[in-house]
Each structure stands twice: as C-alpha cells, then as structure tokens.
Amino acid sequence: MSASNIPTLKLPGGKIVPRLGQGTWRMGESARRRAEEVAALKLGLELGMTLIDTAEMYGDGEAERIVAEAIEGRRDEVFIVSKVLPQNASRAGTIAACERSLKRLNTDRLDLYLLHWRGRYPLKETLAGFQALLRDGLIKAWGVINFDVDDMEELAALPGGDAVATNRCSTISRGGASRPTSSRGPARVAFPSWPIRPSSRAASCATARLPAWPRATGRRRRKWRSPGCSGTRT
C-alpha cells in the first residue's frame, strides 16, 4: 500500500480526504503501549493514511495526545477528526471541549469536529457551538455520527443544519449508527464506516468488501443488524 493507491473522497465543501484513515479508539489506555501506538500512526502516515480519527472520549483524552506526538512537524499533511461527547454538547460545552481537544492535539484547528452521539442537549445548542467554532476558525467542518434517519431529519430542519459533513455507520452493525439517510435529509453527506470488532475475521471481511465512505443514496433504508453485534459506539 502507498499513498498513490489509496482512493480519495471529496467531502461537502470540496476537501479531498483518503477513504482509508486511521482510528485511535483504545489508544492512550496504557502507558506501556504508547510508543507502539505513536509508531503505528506514523507508519500509517507514511503509507498515505493521512486522515486520523480521534475523540475526547478515547483514553480520556490521551489518544489525542498520542496523535499530537505522531503528527509533530506534519500537521498540514494530516486531516484530523475529533469528537465531542454528548454530555459536553451544549453551545458553551461544545466550544470548551473543542478547545481542550486542540490543546491536547497541539494544533490550532480541527479539520472535522463531530458530535459523538445524541444526548440530552437539543441539537440546536450543539449546532450553535459548531457554528461559533467555524466562525472563529477553530474547526473547518462539523458533522455527526451514530445518527438515525429521524436524527438527521431533525438536524436538517435547523437553520444551517444542512451543512453537516458526515454521519458515520458501521460495516458490521447498525445498532449504534442506524439507517443512513432519507429523501428529506441532507443530500451530500459522506458516511465513514467502522467495524465494531476491529480484530475479528468478520470485521476484516466486511471492511474489505464495503466502501470505507459510502455515499448517501437519497432513499430510506431499513435497519439491519449482524447477528451477535451489540452496536458498540466508537
């Protein structure tokens, strides 16, 4: 694998990103693995996987610090995605969470900032936080993950809600990221996918056969769940 043979995707807004990126779920949980995790991310960058997905939840923020170490001196080459936890997703909380992530990542902006899943705060509050961060240049785009059709339609109905860049779904289970879209939702949403059991044979097969960032089709799809999958949020 090399950078030249990794397919790319144009996000709403025109940004080009690799379809195959690096996730950091479970990173930052053990100091003994830190050097290996940093090295793995660096190797991925060398192979052209310049999209790195992280979150304030991962390792209680330590995964973001590992990303910062791995991309030191290469920030402009990397597309960084991070996420705000739903309990932090008020307008003020979203802004504060982003600022903490920026500090841990040692960067002045996020390329994409996501709401990790629905919580108690109204979407309009989270959206107001995203819009403030966009205005101040702290994020370049925003999105959501683990959203069902009804969630996406509610978001699209808000002023500015149709600017959503992404909603994520699983290649193994729709338990936490259900039906991708509908005819009334945003028309140009990218759907990055994730295996809920990264080390399993099933996950390997699924990710090999399904596109990493399937496009919205504009029609409603039925929920489905692979047997034995719990719908784990990542």
Can you annotate each of these PLM segments?
Residues R118-T234:
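Beta/alpha (TIM)-barrel catalytic core signal, keyed to glycine-rich beta->alpha loops juxtaposed to Asp/Glu
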Residues G23-A35, S82-A92, H116, Y121:
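Active-site mouth loops of central-metabolism enzymes
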Residues M1-V78:
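N-terminal binding-site loop/beta-alpha segment at the start of enzyme catalytic domains
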Residues A31-G44, S90-L105, E125-T126, D150-E154, ...:
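Short, acidic/polar
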Residues Q22, I52, V67, I80, ...:
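Conserved, mostly hydrophobic/aromatic
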